Amino acid sequence: MEIETATIATPHKGRPREFCVDMALAAALRVFWSKGYEGASMADLTEAMGITKPSLYAAFGNKEALFNKALDLYEREKADYMHAALDAPTARGVAERLMYGALDMYTCPENPNGCLGVITSVACGAEAECIRQAVLERGAAAKRAMLARFARAKEEGDFPPDTDAEGLAAFLTAVNQGMSVQAGAGATRAELERLVETSLKLWPGR
C-alpha cells in the first residue's frame, strides 16, 4: 500500500521534515470524534497531528476541509458496517447488522465514544452550520439507502403488507443515534446490547 507523505515547513535551515498524511488525518479524526467540530481547536489538531498550522493548511486546506476529509475516513474505516448491512439477505438481517455494527463501533475501547456524525450535528452552532448541514446530508443519504432496501424487502414479501418501511428506517436511525448519545454519556456495552435485543424483538416479519 502506498503511503502518502507531505513536507513540513520548518523555521530552521536544513532539510524539511516529512510526515505521513494518513497518520495525521487519523489523528485529526480522533480529535474531531472526541470534541466535535467546534470543540476541536487548531491547537488541538496540530498537536495531535504533530504538524504546524502552515503544514496543516498546505496538506489539507482549512479546518472545514480537514473535517470533511476526516469524515470521509470515518465512513470508510469506522462506519463501513453500514454498507455491508444493506447486503444482508433479509430486512431483519439488515437491522441486526446495523445495530450491532453501531454497538461495536460505539463501545470499542480504541474509539472515542459515540458517533462522529451525531456528535457534530448536535454540537454545531450557527457559525458551523455548513458543517452541520453536510453531516446531516450524509445521514439523510444513508437513511435513503436504508429505505430503498426496506421498500425492496416489502416487495419481496419480507414484511407484512401493512408495514411502514419509512417508519422502520426512521426507527433504526433513532435507535442508532440514541445509542450514540448514551455511549457518549457512559452507557455500558451490556446496557446498549439490551436496547438492540429489545429493538429486534419488536421487528416485524422474518
Walk through the language-model features, giving the residues of each.
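Helix-turn-helix
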Residues: 2, 23, 27, 31-65, ...
